[in-house]
Amino acid sequence: MNVDNNKGNIPELLWNGTISVRIDYEGNSLAYLANVPRQSYFAQILPNVQRLLAPSIPLSECWLDYNGVPLKWHWPVGLLFDLLTVFDPDTPRAPVLWRIQLRSGLFPTTKILQMETMDTFRTYFFNCLKESDYVRNGSSSGIIALSKAETDTYWNAILNHDYYDFRPIAIKILFSKSKFIPLKIYLGANAPIIQTSAPLGSSLGEFLNKRLPDLFPSCDKFLIVKPVIHGITIFLQSVLDELNRDFCYIDGFLHIVLMKV
Protein backbone atom coordinates (compact mmCIF):
# COMPACT_ATOMS: atom_id res chain seq x y z
CA MET A 1 0.00 0.00 0.00
CA ASN A 2 1.33 3.46 -0.90
CA VAL A 3 -0.31 6.19 1.16
CA ASP A 4 1.43 8.86 -0.93
CA ASN A 5 -0.27 7.77 -4.18
CA ASN A 6 1.83 9.15 -7.05
CA LYS A 7 4.34 10.89 -4.83
CA GLY A 8 6.65 7.88 -4.92
CA ASN A 9 8.21 6.10 -1.99
CA ILE A 10 10.75 8.69 -0.84
CA PRO A 11 9.01 9.43 2.49
CA GLU A 12 8.71 5.72 3.26
CA LEU A 13 12.33 5.04 2.30
CA LEU A 14 13.46 7.83 4.60
CA TRP A 15 11.15 6.55 7.33
CA ASN A 16 12.82 3.14 7.11
CA GLY A 17 16.34 4.56 7.28
CA THR A 18 18.23 3.45 10.40
CA ILE A 19 21.51 4.08 12.19
CA SER A 20 23.38 1.24 13.89
CA VAL A 21 24.04 2.27 17.48
CA ARG A 22 26.06 0.76 20.32
CA ILE A 23 25.55 2.21 23.80
CA ASP A 24 27.95 1.37 26.63
CA TYR A 25 27.95 2.26 30.32
CA GLU A 26 31.17 2.46 32.29
CA GLY A 27 31.56 -0.50 34.63
CA ASN A 28 28.99 -2.67 32.83
CA SER A 29 30.15 -5.38 30.42
CA LEU A 30 26.78 -5.34 28.67
CA ALA A 31 26.08 -3.09 25.70
CA TYR A 32 22.85 -1.91 24.10
CA LEU A 33 22.85 -2.59 20.35
CA ALA A 34 20.09 -1.44 18.01
CA ASN A 35 19.28 -0.17 14.55
CA VAL A 36 17.64 3.11 15.53
CA PRO A 37 15.36 4.82 12.98
CA ARG A 38 16.57 8.19 11.78
CA GLN A 39 12.99 9.37 12.15
CA SER A 40 12.86 8.70 15.88
CA TYR A 41 14.21 10.06 19.16
CA PHE A 42 16.63 8.78 21.76
CA ALA A 43 13.85 9.45 24.26
CA GLN A 44 12.16 6.35 22.85
CA ILE A 45 15.02 4.02 23.77
CA LEU A 46 16.53 5.77 26.80
CA PRO A 47 14.23 3.99 29.31
CA ASN A 48 15.23 0.57 27.88
CA VAL A 49 18.91 1.55 27.86
CA GLN A 50 18.69 2.68 31.48
CA ARG A 51 16.90 -0.51 32.57
CA LEU A 52 19.53 -2.69 30.89
CA LEU A 53 22.72 -0.84 31.74
CA ALA A 54 21.98 1.19 34.87
CA PRO A 55 18.85 -0.20 36.55
CA SER A 56 19.69 1.31 39.93
CA ILE A 57 19.96 4.85 38.53
CA PRO A 58 16.78 6.94 38.09
CA LEU A 59 15.91 7.70 34.48
CA SER A 60 16.00 11.44 35.19
CA GLU A 61 19.68 11.15 36.16
CA CYS A 62 20.73 9.40 32.94
CA TRP A 63 21.75 10.86 29.61
CA LEU A 64 23.50 9.81 26.41
CA ASP A 65 26.83 11.22 25.33
CA TYR A 66 28.88 11.21 22.12
CA ASN A 67 32.51 12.31 22.33
CA GLY A 68 31.77 14.41 25.38
CA VAL A 69 28.66 16.02 23.88
CA PRO A 70 25.38 15.28 25.71
CA LEU A 71 22.77 14.12 23.19
CA LYS A 72 19.48 15.98 23.14
CA TRP A 73 16.90 13.21 23.52
CA HIS A 74 14.23 15.52 22.06
CA TRP A 75 16.06 16.03 18.75
CA PRO A 76 15.61 13.53 15.89
CA VAL A 77 18.25 10.79 15.85
CA GLY A 78 19.11 11.35 12.19
CA LEU A 79 19.67 15.05 12.79
CA LEU A 80 22.00 14.36 15.72
CA PHE A 81 24.00 11.84 13.70
CA ASP A 82 24.48 14.18 10.74
CA LEU A 83 25.31 17.15 12.96
CA LEU A 84 27.72 15.47 15.39
CA THR A 85 29.49 12.81 13.34
CA VAL A 86 29.80 15.04 10.24
CA PHE A 87 30.10 11.99 7.97
CA ASP A 88 30.11 13.22 4.39
CA PRO A 89 27.23 11.50 2.56
CA ASP A 90 29.18 11.69 -0.69
CA THR A 91 32.31 9.92 0.60
CA PRO A 92 32.27 6.11 0.21
CA ARG A 93 32.76 4.37 3.54
CA ALA A 94 32.01 1.16 5.36
CA PRO A 95 28.81 0.97 7.43
CA VAL A 96 29.19 2.99 10.61
CA LEU A 97 28.46 1.81 14.14
CA TRP A 98 27.67 4.91 16.17
CA ARG A 99 29.28 4.40 19.59
CA ILE A 100 27.52 6.28 22.36
CA GLN A 101 27.96 6.32 26.13
CA LEU A 102 25.25 6.22 28.79
CA ARG A 103 26.17 8.65 31.56
CA SER A 104 24.87 9.32 35.05
CA GLY A 105 25.87 11.53 37.94
CA LEU A 106 26.18 15.31 37.75
CA PHE A 107 23.54 16.06 35.13
CA PRO A 108 24.52 18.64 32.47
CA THR A 109 21.42 20.76 32.99
CA THR A 110 22.87 23.69 31.02
CA LYS A 111 23.15 21.55 27.88
CA ILE A 112 20.21 19.15 27.82
CA LEU A 113 16.81 18.66 29.40
CA GLN A 114 16.17 15.97 31.97
CA MET A 115 13.75 13.27 30.89
CA GLU A 116 11.49 12.31 33.76
CA THR A 117 9.03 10.02 31.96
CA MET A 118 7.69 9.34 28.48
CA ASP A 119 5.03 11.97 29.22
CA THR A 120 7.87 14.50 29.31
CA PHE A 121 8.78 13.46 25.78
CA ARG A 122 5.18 13.53 24.57
CA THR A 123 4.61 17.05 25.90
CA TYR A 124 7.80 18.35 24.31
CA PHE A 125 7.10 16.66 20.98
CA PHE A 126 3.60 18.07 20.58
CA ASN A 127 4.84 21.52 21.56
CA CYS A 128 7.35 21.27 18.69
CA LEU A 129 4.60 20.10 16.36
CA LYS A 130 2.43 23.08 17.34
CA GLU A 131 5.39 25.37 16.77
CA SER A 132 5.93 24.11 13.23
CA ASP A 133 2.19 24.30 12.56
CA TYR A 134 2.21 27.93 13.68
CA VAL A 135 5.03 28.73 11.24
CA ARG A 136 3.17 26.98 8.41
CA ASN A 137 -0.23 28.51 8.93
CA GLY A 138 0.00 31.41 11.38
CA SER A 139 -1.68 29.38 14.10
CA SER A 140 -1.52 25.94 15.71
CA SER A 141 -5.13 25.19 14.86
CA GLY A 142 -4.23 22.21 12.68
CA ILE A 143 -2.75 20.34 15.62
CA ILE A 144 -5.32 21.56 18.13
CA ALA A 145 -8.16 20.47 15.81
CA LEU A 146 -7.01 16.85 15.75
CA SER A 147 -9.40 14.50 17.50
CA LYS A 148 -8.13 12.55 20.48
CA ALA A 149 -8.17 9.41 18.35
CA GLU A 150 -6.04 11.09 15.66
CA THR A 151 -3.63 12.49 18.24
CA ASP A 152 -3.24 9.10 19.88
CA THR A 153 -2.81 7.38 16.51
CA TYR A 154 -0.11 9.86 15.50
CA TRP A 155 1.72 9.48 18.80
CA ASN A 156 1.52 5.69 18.83
CA ALA A 157 2.69 5.58 15.21
CA ILE A 158 5.82 7.44 16.28
CA LEU A 159 6.39 5.18 19.29
CA ASN A 160 5.78 2.02 17.23
CA HIS A 161 7.44 3.41 14.10
CA ASP A 162 4.35 2.63 12.03
CA TYR A 163 4.54 4.51 8.74
CA TYR A 164 1.04 3.62 7.55
CA ASP A 165 -0.62 5.02 10.67
CA PHE A 166 1.69 8.03 10.72
CA ARG A 167 1.64 9.24 7.12
CA PRO A 168 -2.08 9.96 6.53
CA ILE A 169 -2.25 12.21 9.59
CA ALA A 170 1.09 13.81 8.71
CA ILE A 171 -0.25 14.68 5.25
CA LYS A 172 -3.32 16.25 6.85
CA ILE A 173 -1.51 18.41 9.40
CA LEU A 174 1.86 19.10 7.76
CA PHE A 175 1.29 19.46 4.04
CA SER A 176 -2.33 20.06 3.09
CA LYS A 177 -2.65 23.80 3.83
CA SER A 178 0.89 25.10 4.31
CA LYS A 179 1.53 28.80 3.63
CA PHE A 180 5.20 28.67 4.63
CA ILE A 181 7.78 25.95 5.20
CA PRO A 182 9.37 25.82 8.67
CA LEU A 183 13.13 25.22 8.61
CA LYS A 184 15.96 24.87 11.09
CA ILE A 185 19.47 25.29 9.71
CA TYR A 186 22.52 23.97 11.57
CA LEU A 187 25.95 25.48 10.90
CA GLY A 188 27.71 23.18 13.39
CA ALA A 189 27.27 21.48 16.74
CA ASN A 190 28.22 24.61 18.68
CA ALA A 191 26.72 27.24 16.39
CA PRO A 192 23.34 28.89 17.02
CA ILE A 193 20.42 27.32 15.18
CA ILE A 194 18.90 29.41 12.42
CA GLN A 195 15.15 28.94 12.73
CA THR A 196 13.31 30.48 9.83
CA SER A 197 10.58 29.93 7.25
CA ALA A 198 10.57 29.78 3.48
CA PRO A 199 7.86 30.72 0.99
CA LEU A 200 6.35 28.07 -1.22
CA GLY A 201 7.53 27.79 -4.79
CA SER A 202 11.21 28.67 -4.52
CA SER A 203 14.21 26.37 -4.84
CA LEU A 204 16.44 25.51 -1.91
CA GLY A 205 19.33 27.30 -3.61
CA GLU A 206 17.33 30.49 -4.11
CA PHE A 207 16.28 30.49 -0.48
CA LEU A 208 19.76 29.80 0.91
CA ASN A 209 21.32 32.38 -1.41
CA LYS A 210 18.99 35.03 0.01
CA ARG A 211 19.20 33.85 3.63
CA LEU A 212 22.92 32.96 3.79
CA PRO A 213 24.60 34.65 0.82
CA ASP A 214 28.11 34.37 2.27
CA LEU A 215 27.78 30.57 2.42
CA PHE A 216 25.71 30.21 -0.75
CA PRO A 217 26.95 32.82 -3.25
CA SER A 218 25.52 30.62 -5.99
CA CYS A 219 21.93 29.41 -6.29
CA ASP A 220 22.89 26.19 -8.04
CA LYS A 221 26.45 25.17 -7.05
CA PHE A 222 28.05 24.04 -3.79
CA LEU A 223 31.03 26.33 -3.24
CA ILE A 224 31.55 26.49 0.54
CA VAL A 225 29.02 24.25 2.26
CA LYS A 226 26.30 21.86 1.15
CA PRO A 227 22.88 21.09 2.68
CA VAL A 228 22.29 17.62 4.11
CA ILE A 229 18.93 16.21 5.21
CA HIS A 230 18.48 12.63 6.44
CA GLY A 231 22.10 11.89 5.56
CA ILE A 232 21.54 12.90 1.92
CA THR A 233 23.14 15.81 0.09
CA ILE A 234 20.31 17.90 -1.34
CA PHE A 235 20.68 19.57 -4.74
CA LEU A 236 20.21 23.32 -4.63
CA GLN A 237 17.78 23.09 -7.54
CA SER A 238 15.37 21.07 -5.36
CA VAL A 239 11.98 22.73 -4.97
CA LEU A 240 11.22 23.50 -1.33
CA ASP A 241 7.60 22.33 -1.66
CA GLU A 242 8.81 18.87 -2.66
CA LEU A 243 11.44 18.78 0.07
CA ASN A 244 8.77 19.72 2.58
CA ARG A 245 6.54 16.91 1.34
CA ASP A 246 9.21 14.20 1.16
CA PHE A 247 12.00 15.18 3.59
CA CYS A 248 10.15 16.84 6.45
CA TYR A 249 10.95 15.41 9.88
CA ILE A 250 8.16 14.09 12.06
CA ASP A 251 8.10 17.28 14.15
CA GLY A 252 7.09 19.27 11.07
CA PHE A 253 10.44 20.98 10.44
CA LEU A 254 12.94 20.63 7.63
CA HIS A 255 16.18 20.19 9.59
CA ILE A 256 19.10 21.13 7.32
CA VAL A 257 22.69 20.43 8.37
CA LEU A 258 25.34 22.40 6.49
CA MET A 259 28.58 20.50 5.82
CA LYS A 260 31.80 21.75 4.28
CA VAL A 261 32.26 20.94 0.60
Curated annotation (Swiss-Prot):
Record location of the Glycyl lysine isopeptide (Lys-Gly) (interchain with G-Cter in ATG12) cross-link: K148
Mode of membrane association: Peripheral membrane protein
Organism: Schizosaccharomyces pombe (strain 972 / ATCC 24843)
Subcellular location(s) of the protein: Cytoplasm; Nucleus; Preautophagosomal structure membrane
Disruption phenotype: Impairs atg8-processing.
Role: Involved in cytoplasm to vacuole transport (Cvt) and autophagic vesicle formation. Autophagy is essential for maintenance of amino acid levels and protein synthesis under nitrogen starvation. Required for selective autophagic degradation of the nucleus (nucleophagy). Also required for mitophagy, which eliminates defective or superfluous mitochondria in order to fulfill cellular energy requirements and prevent excess ROS production.
Keywords on record: Autophagy, Cytoplasm, Isopeptide bond, Meiosis, Membrane, Nucleus, Protein transport, Transport, Ubl conjugation
Subunit organization: Conjugated with atg12. Interacts with atg16 and atg18.
InterPro entries: Atg5, ATG5_HBR, Atg5_HR, ATG5_UblA, Atg5_UblA_dom_sf, ATG5_UblB
Signal sequence coordinates: none
Protein name: Autophagy protein 5
Superkingdom assignment: Eukaryota
One Pfam short name: ATG5_HBR
Family (UniProt): Belongs to the ATG5 family.
A cellular component term, taken from the record's GO annotations: phagophore assembly site membrane
UniProt PTM: Conjugated to atg12; which is essential for autophagy.
Gene3D superfamilies per the UniProt record, alphabetical: 3.10.20.620, Autophagy protein Apg5, helix rich domain, Phosphatidylinositol 3-kinase Catalytic Subunit, Chain A, domain 1
Biological process annotations from GO: aggrephagy; autophagosome assembly; cellular response to nitrogen starvation; macroautophagy; meiotic cell cycle; mitophagy; piecemeal microautophagy of the nucleus; protein transport
Main location: cytoplasm
Keyword Protein transport in record: yes
Keyword Transport: yes
